Amino acid sequence: MYNLRLLRNLLPIAGHAHPRWLASQHKRRPQPGSLPADRLDQLRSDLFERRHELSGAEWTEVRRSLVDGYKHINGHNVDAVILGVCSAPNQLSLAKSYVEFLRSRGSKPNAATLGRLLRVYNAAYHERPLSEAEQSEILQICRSLQAEHETLDASSCENVIHGLVATSGDDWQRGLPLLEMMKVTSTPSVAAYSALAEKAFSVATPEQELAWRLLEEMATARKPPKCEVYLALLNRLANETAQLPAQLSLLLQFLERHEILVSQRVAIRLQELSSQVPQLLHTRTTHLGGLGKCQSCQQHLQPVAISDEEFRQLSECFLERVLIRRDVFQRSTPEEVARFKKFVEKTAPYDCVIDGLNVAYSTGTKKTPQQLAKLVATVVRHFREQDKRVLVLGREHMRNWSKQAMHYVHCNASLFLTSNLSHDDPFLLYATLRSGQETDFFSRDLMRSHAFHLGTELKPIFRRWQQEHQFSLVTQTQTGQIIVKEPVRHRLCAHQVADTWHVPYCAQYTPHPTDSFEVPANWLCIQMKEQTIPATKTKTKTTR
């Protein structure tokens, strides 16, 4: 056991904070319930590692030192802070020891503390099977939280869901109403969705329809599922090969529909699955050569271009769903929109539509008006030298920029200046779409909100059109030359070419993937074969 003198050396007390823990005190104050990473790691390594329990006196000293030593830690949140430090899968006994300590001194653990304890149970569940006693403890905590609060806040709902999915039987399905409860005040988190979808795939009798519904809800809300969901499905298919072709096809189509990159963990599991059932699946890692040629199967990836019918639908819906949306008129007027549409009818079609302000400020905002105007003129010259017809969109204040540079723009391009308060993007996209399917546009803006407002059916069509037609400025050299990023003409998400799927993957999962059109470095080349022998039930070790 640690003695109290050693504990006082490890933990700062009021007026005598440990020098190492005082580092970076000027930085942003941590949120309640958390500790800065360096101090958290020291507390974990110096005190909690390899310990399964602490004495009451030790817990008292830990608690007092944290409350006295940190302004953001108080008697209300200190318990959650401590359980946040004891959160590793092998620290369940230590976390339970602290909760028992609280109860022994007559303190009732609050919802945040019990929620943190449920997350530790869940971490242990992903490392080893939980005992019946541990599962009973989880259910008791969940029942007590729900009995005390008719409506749980979103954080408590998420914690209870993580507890319920760590149990066997049907109790995990009690998490579904909690997911609906979260929707009352917020969008359910990636963690809550993923926990339930993973469980739906991995239970003895899979709830596949439910799992896919949850995945669709997540992706539609721009919340990419965690790796564990895909791994649960792949582990299931390793044991039930009869379902592999249909379910794997659903997975690949899902990744394509929502332009999701899986992580390397999932890619490795797909390769392992392929080696387990070579009669059904052939998977290789690959990379792309010039013009999107797969270096494994030698096929070219599918062109990103959309069909004439898809372009027609996109053009017709854009005006209604984006250009005349209420928040556009908050930054513009119906009169200005009408004036712009009349201008486009008179001067279109264009080969390229340029966002003048976006170009001007793309190499930095601390430029003189003369430098800003000169950069816009340089981009116009880039396209005029290719004999392109150009439209430049800007704001009224650009009239005050360098007369020489703006004169060049005016003489070599159509120029439309909106009110200084207007949004440029809707005007830019309208003019580009109105000019036809061959017209490009020049902007660094990723157009996320516009894609979102087009809806789930048109969003992927818009994204493909955007990828094919968007140019942007990379930089301007010291000699004044510009380096332009040209569009990638092949698809960048999972898709099928003939009998082969090409699936991009990234190094690790991120809940906030970029929307940029960068070519992924890593790909899988997957061929699903027609089944020629009866499916067998393969005995494999399931990875949680």
From Swiss-Prot:
Limits of the PRORP domain: 291-525
Binding site for Mg(2+) 2: D425, D445
Signal peptide: none
Binding site for Zn(2+): C294, C297, H502, C525
KW Transport (keyword) present: no
Disulfide-bonded cysteines: none
InterPro entries xref list: MRPP3_PIN_dom, PRORP_C, TPR-like_helical_dom_sf
Cofactor field: Mg(2+)
Chain residues that bind Mg(2+) 1: D355, D424
GO terms, molecular function: metal ion binding; ribonuclease P activity
Effect on the protein of changing Y121D: Pupal lethal; pupation is developmentally delayed, and pupae fail to enclose into adults
Localization per Swiss-Prot or TrEMBL: Mitochondrion
Keyword set, alphabetical order: Hydrolase, Magnesium, Metal-binding, Mitochondrion, Nuclease, Transit peptide, tRNA processing, Zinc
Catalyzed reactions per annotation: Endonucleolytic cleavage of RNA, removing 5'-extranucleotides from tRNA precursor
Any GO CC annotation of this UniProt entry: mitochondrial ribonuclease P complex
GO annotation terms (biological process): mitochondrial tRNA 5'-end processing; mitochondrial tRNA processing; tRNA 5'-leader removal
Organelle transit peptide: 1-22
Deletion phenotype: RNAi-mediated knockdown is pupal lethal, with the majority of pupae undergoing pupation but then most fail to enclose into adults. Larvae also display reduced levels of ATP. Conditional RNAi-mediated knockdown in different tissues, produce various phenotypes that result from adherent, dysfunctional mitochondria. RNAi-mediated knockdown in skeletal muscle is pupal lethal; pupation rates are normal but pupae fail to enclose. Also reduces sarcomere size, and affects myofibril organization and structure. Cardiac-specific RNAi-mediated knockdown results in adult wing defects.
Domain of life: Eukaryota
Quaternary structure note: Catalytic component of mitochondrial ribonuclease P, a complex composed of rswl/MRPP1, scu/MRPP2 and mldr/MRPP3.
PANTHER family assigned: MITOCHONDRIAL RIBONUCLEASE P CATALYTIC SUBUNIT, PTHR13547
Family: Belongs to the PPR family. P subfamily.
Purpose of the protein: Catalytic ribonuclease component of mitochondrial ribonuclease P, a complex composed of rswl/MRPP1, scu/MRPP2 and mldr/MRPP3, which cleaves tRNA molecules in their 5'-ends. Essential for the structural and functional integrity of mitochondria. Function is essential for pupal development.
Protein name: Mitochondrial ribonuclease P catalytic subunit
Organism annotation: Drosophila melanogaster
